[in-house]
Amino acid sequence: STAANANVIFKGSGWGHGVGLSQYGAKAMGLDGASYEQILKRYFTNIGITGLNETESSSFIITDETPLSVGILQNSSTVLFIVQSGKAQLCFDQSNFCVGTANPGETFRFGAEEIGKCAFLRVNGDKSVTKIGTSGNCSASVIPTSVKTEIFIPYKARSYKSGILRFRERSDSVRINTVYELGVEDYLKGLSEVPDSWPLASIQAQVIVSRSYAVWKALQRGEE
């Protein structure tokens, strides 16, 4: 009889896309003593691992403090937000003019008053609203004044910090897209791809892959 082949190959991707790093494969390699370089080179062939400062030194990825944009809401008529801690400036980007300051615990609504004109409205305790300053172009921002500033978006039931909340009018309507701009390292703090109890090398490999993917997508999109 013919001896069985000693090598067995399994193919599959579980519920994922099957491309790139396998988290559980990285965990197994980490438990087996592999370094993060060895883990990465197992899943990505012909690669080098280089710092961003060396490969993108003149790119907006390095020169812009908040080069990454994370979509929060699309095609909404208004956006409700609450300043949970710290303070933030309410600004219109086209005129580079800030109409007021949002204080801790205050609730605001941003939306269109007419075609091409939007306003910040403070929502009072009795549900009435107070317009903050004058109206402006619908490209606007909520800019934190300190590292403690945290902004809550009720529709998403999530809080955001270490970045800038941006509103952008859609080109095809008076409705608004909302994004959160932040730095590469601050973006990585929000990831939870693998538990922190996993081997350090496995976590390091995941961080490098996540950083590389985020930067690649940002470079594809280009600077705003």
What function would you assign to each model-found segment?
Residues 1-224:
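Conserved, single-site charged/polar hotspot
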